């Protein structure tokens, strides 16, 4: 069965002032109704490379942002601008390929994983859809990579993604260490609980084409990430929104920053000391928005739950311990955890 892609719908809708009904959100979700207008949220910005920030200071800044916000931006992160530019260039070129070429790596029908080119990710409540196409594939560790889900075109796609994966590892270690120390653990403990050297780096490219009615649609609906941590690179088109104090706010990107989301697994492992961020994405009438999140995930068979030394009689476990793959299944199918 042929799947209708949002990119194709966008092209057909260019001269219209309407979108298919399945993309129109309920009034309680519509950005025009629910966004706090005229206010842009300044989420914390943390300088990872500043000589003024001691390790102790960085730990404090990252831990506070993760407790209070669940989202922050990092600058001077050590990933070369060139590596990010190449990642973005090849991703954009993939989505500009003829449709039949993209379909070569489409998610197979009935496939239980998320890897591949696609449009639908999770159970759609009320038949409502997000205004986005995507491509998922693992970029690290090499033992977990399935190149069948990587594009052959553009020719430099593999090189750019592998270079970015290697460059990312220093930032990943720094974040896990700070988050561990920030709740009184040894610096290696949260990464070890997330899989250690088997930690999965799952890249997703989000492609949000122009939408004639951005006031009615959403790119990705409100959610928290399943991952431990998400490290995201956006293009220049704004669109990320965060839910804070019962309102939806636009988040302003800092040029050359990485956007860090605390995901469900860090909230679970920290037994609620850190908060996964509730967020969504809006779309643009005239411009294509793209983003490149990397979800840092435990291996599927790994048991994840609150770290035992954080559980006491006064602070009992707030979450179940279960295999990560079971957590993912429940989340994608909107089942209770």
From Swiss-Prot:
Copy the pathway line from the protein's UniProt record.
Answer: Secondary metabolite biosynthesis; flavonoid biosynthesis
Recorded GO molecular functions are: flavanone 3-dioxygenase activity; flavonol synthase activity; L-ascorbic acid binding; metal ion binding
Q: Which residues form the Fe2OG dioxygenase domain?
A: 198-298
Q: Which UniProt keywords apply?
A: Dioxygenase, Flavonoid biosynthesis, Iron, Metal-binding, Oxidoreductase, Vitamin C
> Which parts of the sequence bind Fe cation?
223, 225, 279
UniProt cofactor note: Binds 1 ascorbate molecule per subunit. Binds 1 Fe cation per subunit.
Its function? Catalyzes the formation of flavonols from dihydroflavonols. Acts on (2S)-naringenin and (+)-trans-dihydrokaempferol to produce kaempferol and on (2R)-naringenin to produce (-)-trans-dihydrokaempferol.
Question: For this protein, what reaction is catalysed?
Answer: a (2R,3R)-dihydroflavonol + 2-oxoglutarate + O2 = a flavonol + succinate + CO2 + H2O; a (2S)-flavan-4-one + 2-oxoglutarate + O2 = a (2R,3R)-dihydroflavonol + succinate + CO2
Q: Where are the transmembrane segments?
A: none
Q: Is Protein biosynthesis among the key words of this record?
A: no
UniProt entry tagged with the keyword Ribonucleoprotein: no
This protein's name: Flavonol synthase/flavanone 3-hydroxylase
> Which cofactor does this sequence's record say it needs?
L-ascorbate; Fe cation
Q: Which Enzyme Commission number(s) are on file for it?
A: 1.14.11.9, 1.14.20.6
Q: Spell out the family assignment given in the record's similarity comment.
A: Belongs to the iron/ascorbate-dependent oxidoreductase family.
Stored InterPro entries? DIOX_N, IPNS-like_FE2OG_OXY, IPNS-like_sf, Oxoglu/Fe-dep_dioxygenase_dom, Plant_2OG-oxidoreductases
